[in-house]
Amino acid sequence: MERIMFRAKIHRATVTQADLDYVGSVTIDQDLLDAADILVNEKVDIWNITNGNRLHTYALSGPRGSGVIGINGAAAHLMRPGDMVIIAAFGNFSEEEARTLEPKVVLVDAKNRLLELQPV
């Protein structure tokens, strides 16, 4: 049996832009994607700490070092620049893999610069 397990998150990032007219997705600074081991086009959940909204979308790469967390498309109705969010990724793992999984937690500062990688 496979289990769906939490495997990585970017914790308490700040939304820097919201573009209602973009087709969809979330644009994330490539440095943060690398730190969290999230791939371009990978499904992610976004949990808005500021207002409680939650959604599923997919990740796009933003410029390295930019700190960009850009909410695109219809999701821009749910999240605004300045909102604090958690961006999480999950994966399917065998029973054995699930029991030894060590998720990555990427902690960022107010400008979405990497502060620390922290295991759960």
From Swiss-Prot:
The gene is panD. GO terms for cellular component: cytosol. Its cofactor is pyruvate. It is found in: Cytoplasm. Is synthesized initially as an inactive proenzyme, which is activated by self-cleavage at a specific serine bond to produce a beta-subunit with a hydroxyl group at its C-terminus and an alpha-subunit with a pyruvoyl group at its N-terminus. GO terms for biological process: alanine biosynthetic process; pantothenate biosynthetic process. Keywords: Autocatalytic cleavage, Cytoplasm, Decarboxylase, Lyase, Pantothenate biosynthesis, Pyruvate, Schiff base, Zymogen. Catalyzes the pyruvoyl-dependent decarboxylation of aspartate to produce beta-alanine. The active site is at S25, Y58. The modification Pyruvic acid (Ser) is found at S25. Heterooctamer of four alpha and four beta subunits. It comes from Deinococcus radiodurans (strain ATCC 13939 / DSM 20539 / JCM 16871 / CCUG 27074 / LMG 4051 / NBRC 15346 / NCIMB 9279 / VKM B-1422 / R1). This is Aspartate 1-decarboxylase. GO terms for molecular function: aspartate 1-decarboxylase activity. Its EC number is 4.1.1.11. It catalyses: L-aspartate + H(+) = beta-alanine + CO2. Its main location: cytoplasm. Binds 1 pyruvoyl group covalently per subunit. Pathway: Cofactor biosynthesis; (R)-pantothenate biosynthesis; beta-alanine from L-aspartate: step 1/1. Belongs to the PanD family.
